[in-house]
């Protein structure tokens, strides 16, 4: 019993130290930019207990907060949070987006789906991190259930035409694509013994890349209302025991990132850079659904579904597979192009007498 108490105490201390580290240390997105700047000799000053950091001195300084900078306008950020407005602006510039509209009730969602054509996507108009997003919905029951979840994640709900393909996150910095990652769906495979809930713990959450701390690129999977709806579409619950080799879809947008930066077609790069400019963001995370990112968008009926301000960088720093991308260096170089003067002269004068005349010389 004493040994068990000691183990429990040590685990508790370790957890508290991790929480303390999360509170005191810069987040990974901010840290990678600061580290890249310091490698060039650019000084940094932490301005808050959070992630607000000053790079450079005086009139030469720039400020960042994760992947947002002092040039990220409130207008552009507000536009990016409104998915329907963003799509309208992108369409006016010729950027491909999925057809859709906002809806006000479950019945309205079903009516919109019929007008657009099945299958559809249902998602909150101002949600984030993929919460409340449901894809490839066919039936009235699925669409109305998805509406009920999506409305809890945002102020309004958007119904869109479903685009066939994989979701990609493309990072644009200063009108240039610097990283791209492909998302993968999350599945478990039945063994005839364990429940879906147990399989999630065994096959998904055991991955060391999953955790609640900021250094973990992937979050643990929990059976929330979104997962419950996904399981219900497969006539399952968290307590169901799938048969041997029976694959069960857990999350359609599991945010498991695979680096595909080297595969981005020039047409794709041009379109996503244009999307960032239309919204007004110098640093943007563009969500694109495409079957093959190495082909032009027009050849595959692909579409841009979201433009995000202050995008997370961890998926590019620690992809599930593929090479990490130097996104911190790219952002630092954008803020301070090579050859830029980022310091101001600082001279200290000390002594017992004559300090003022010397300082005024």
Q: Where are the regions a protein language model picked out?
A:
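Activation segment
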Residues: 183-186, 291, 310-312
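A long amphipathic alpha-helix within ATP-dependent nucleotide-binding catalytic cores
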Residues: 149, 153, 202-294
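Active-site nucleotide/adenylate-binding loops and adjacent lid/helix of ATP-dependent enzymes
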Residues: 59-220, 266-269
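Phosphate-binding loop of NTP-binding sites
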Residues: 337-361
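N-terminal pre-Walker A segment at the start of P-loop NTPase domains
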Residues: 319-334
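Short glycine/threonine-rich loop-to-helix capping motif typified by GTGT followed
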Residues: 294-301
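Glycine-rich phosphate/pyrophosphate-binding beta-alpha loops
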Residues: 306-317
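Conserved N-proximal alpha/beta basic substrate-recognition cap immediately N-terminal to
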Residues: 1-115, 128, 348, 354-358
């Amino acid at each position: 019993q004493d040994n068990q108490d000691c183990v429990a105490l040590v685990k508790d201390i370790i957890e508290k130290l991790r929480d303390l580290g999360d509170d005191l240390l810069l987040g990974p997105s901010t840290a990678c930019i600061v580290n890249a700047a310091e490698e060039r000799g650019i000084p940094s000053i932490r301005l808050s207990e959070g992630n607000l950091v000053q790079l450079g001195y005086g009139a030469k300084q720039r400020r960042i907060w994760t992947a947002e900078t002092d040039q990220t306008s409130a207008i552009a950020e507000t536009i990016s949070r409104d998915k329907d407005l963003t799509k309208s602006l992108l369409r006016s510039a010729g950027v491909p987006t999925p057809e859709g509209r906002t809806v006000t009730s479950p019945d309205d969602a079903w009516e919109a789906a019929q007008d657009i054509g099945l299958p559809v996507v249902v998602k909150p108009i101002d949600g984030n991190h993929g919460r409340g997003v449901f894809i490839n919905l066919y039936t009235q029951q699925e669409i109305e259930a998805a509406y009920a979840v999506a409305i809890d994640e945002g102020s309004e709900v958007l119904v869109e035409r479903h685009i066939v393909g994989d979701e990609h996150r493309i990072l644009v910095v200063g009108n240039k694509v610097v990283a791209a990652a492909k998302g993968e769906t999350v599945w478990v495979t039945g063994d005839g013994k364990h429940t879906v809930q147990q399989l999630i713990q065994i096959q998904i959450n055991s991955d060391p890349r999953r955790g609640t701390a900021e250094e973990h690129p992937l979050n643990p999977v929990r059976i929330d209302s979104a997962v419950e709806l996904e399981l219900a579409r497969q006539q399952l619950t968290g307590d169901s025991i799938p048969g041997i080799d029976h694959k069960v879809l857990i999350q359609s947008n599991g945010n498991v990132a695979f680096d595909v930066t080297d595969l981005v077609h020039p047409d794709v790069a041009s379109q996503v850079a244009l999307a960032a400019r239309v919204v007004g963001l110098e640093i943007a995370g563009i969500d694109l659904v495409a079957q093959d990112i190495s082909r032009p968008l027009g050849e595959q009926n692909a579409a841009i579904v979201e433009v995000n301000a202050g995008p997370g960088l961890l998926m590019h720093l620690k992809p599930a597979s593929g090479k990490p991308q130097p996104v911190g260096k790219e952002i630092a170089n954008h803020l301070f192009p090579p050859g830029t003067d980022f310091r101001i002269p600082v001279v200290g004068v000390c002594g017992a007498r004559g300090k003022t005349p010397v300082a005024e010389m």
